[in-house]
């Protein structure tokens, strides 16, 4: 049941993207990016709202043209989640979306232009209280760094980042975060490790262009898991060639696995074998779909037999241990008198889980109230 994470977070400064705190011990923010055409306002708004529904803290939107900037204005008016404008090549687009209430500007050092252009963006951001993300990517390094290093290396990515960190420092602008993304896990991990030793600004994590839903999730979990376990990272995005909603789900699953940020149900379920007394896979899949709206952090174990079932149930908020015809049910580690019919588990478990979530929410509300009074 909800053990505390042993991970000690890297100290960092604090910025805000809209009303979302980033860095300095704030919860690690999970974000995604729209893949609609930004000029299709209705489709983009719909996708942003679907991301917000599954818990996205921040959403990034590509703004490649002035026409897209005008569409961004309309999009911003229709959503409540903080929006980051993704800017490449034309710094003037950053100035335009700043007028329309953007919550953060992402600029790419590899293509945004010279220091004078960066100064224009920084001056505008300062005037309007907008933070910036320096977003370095292994696939779009500056040409001189490509020539110097021959290929993307941790040193090349970090040198690119530090050039722009130094510019922002000279301009006395400290409201920024940094990312050094690469599609190779070790390149990304080593780049972030090196950067973390050089600056104390918040770091945005990601394995860029990670791949499809399955392979990309695994690659991201490995790479980001390594960094997060070392305390590195203040916000993250899982980059998948898939529905952006999956990026949010995977991001929270990674944080949940490391006990860094728990949101929703942590299902402990066996892969099933011939000893299973009920359909474990079907039961878990059905419960995951039915209970996506439950945000209460809790552990629920669904084990198909008595080999590991009781042991897992004893350390879960709720647990089911498969047995012949009727399965044993546990709450807070204690076996209950009632047993569940193996042919009708999903509805019974859903009701129990929702009731438990409500009780935990009420307990948490009371605990918070007592802390505030003290």
Swiss-Prot record:
[4Fe-4S] cluster binds at residues 270, 273, 305, 312. Disulfide bonds: none annotated. Pathway: Isoprenoid biosynthesis; isopentenyl diphosphate biosynthesis via DXP pathway; isopentenyl diphosphate from 1-deoxy-D-xylulose 5-phosphate: step 5/6. GO terms for molecular function: 4 iron, 4 sulfur cluster binding; 4-hydroxy-3-methylbut-2-en-1-yl diphosphate synthase activity (ferredoxin); 4-hydroxy-3-methylbut-2-enyl-diphosphate synthase activity (flavodoxin); iron ion binding. Its cofactor is [4Fe-4S] cluster. GO terms for biological process: isopentenyl diphosphate biosynthetic process, methylerythritol 4-phosphate pathway; terpenoid biosynthetic process. It catalyses: (2E)-4-hydroxy-3-methylbut-2-enyl diphosphate + oxidized [flavodoxin] + H2O + 2 H(+) = 2-C-methyl-D-erythritol 2,4-cyclic diphosphate + reduced [flavodoxin]. Converts 2C-methyl-D-erythritol 2,4-cyclodiphosphate (ME-2,4cPP) into 1-hydroxy-2-methyl-2-(E)-butenyl 4-diphosphate. Belongs to the IspG family. This is 4-hydroxy-3-methylbut-2-en-1-yl diphosphate synthase (flavodoxin).
